[in-house]
Amino acid sequence: MKILNFFYENHPKFEISYERKVQIPLCNIIIKGPKFSGKKTLIFNYLSQFKPNEILFLNLHDTRFENQSLEHLSNFLEKNAQIKFLCIYNVEFALNLQDIKIPIIISTDKKDLHIEGFQELELDYFDFEEFVSISRKNLPINNLVGLFLQSGRSKLGEKNILLRQNFNTLELEILKYLALNLGQQISISKLFLELKKRLKTSKDSVYHTIKELENTYIIHPISHDEKKLQKIYFRDFGLRNNLCIQKDFAHLFENLILNELFKFKQEFFYNKFFTFYSKVSKIAYISSSTLDIDLIKLRAKKILSKSLELGIFHVVFITLSSEDSFFEQGVKFEVLPFDKFSLGF
């Protein structure tokens, strides 16, 4: 119990920082999300309403912590009845917490971690609306869009050194390949052959690593709506420019749009007509960063029959600055600059 007592007495400062759009409910909960998504900030904001001696905060990634001490957790809490809240941070495996009688918050970056009796809350990186709110810069909206594109949604997209600190060699090589092929259809076999030129690995290792990068919210695959094909994007579009020097604004902008669509909590698909579309909401999105209105209207006519075939009656072209709206055979075609698209949800 010495370790538990050490962390109880040497707790972090539970101070209020910036507010997120999501809030922690009053129940046992697992907060899931990628590294550097703000899970700790969200938790500290919530815990700031309690006195420090009422909280036991355990960071399982702290090198001084021993997992065996969790076996004594129930007894420790019984002997310290003043503790009213338990937080276990950076959990990577299922815990047996059935004997714990006080509210519990768990944080993890594992999508597949589930614990019986716990609700789950996914915390994504900042979207553009939160970026504008937190940056507090009195700048024109176009300038803020530019800053967002430069910085990305997290520290991983902003600070190169964090990549080597948080990913092994195979993970980094996979991420570099995905960055260079962003927005392209990805073949795992082709990826494996490329990686074999640079390091010793196996196809199983590559496949497992890709699955783990998805499970830890680093990458996000999008499936073709009819064929067994997929594209792989980043949960933080900013990762792309931190992994390679080649410029590819068109696909970076695609990734940015997908990141904003995450807030809908829907599955999206792609085909040669639509960058992304939802079979649930029946809305399609087309990344058109630099197309002018006349070219967009020409493209709208070319995809009209496919829209009607799929029952899609709302198509949104997302641009950097153009704006318009028109109808073709009952289908609404909307042209929106990125800021209005993002802030209009």
Residue ranges and their predicted role:
Residues I102-Q185, S189, K197:
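Interdomain motor-coupling "hinge/lid" segment immediately C-terminal to the ATP-binding subdomain
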Residues I161-K282:
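Accessory nucleic acid-recognition modules appended to NTPase machines
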Residues K2-I3, K32-F36, T41, H224, ...:
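A cross-kingdom feature that marks ATP-driven nucleic-acid transaction machinery
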Residues S48-L56, Q266:
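Post-Walker A helix-loop "phosphate-sensing" segment adjacent to the P-loop in P-loop NTPases
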Residues N53-A81:
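Short glycine-rich substrate-engagement loop in P-loop NTPases that contacts/grips substrate
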Residues M1-P25:
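N-terminal pre-Walker A segment at the start of P-loop NTPase domains
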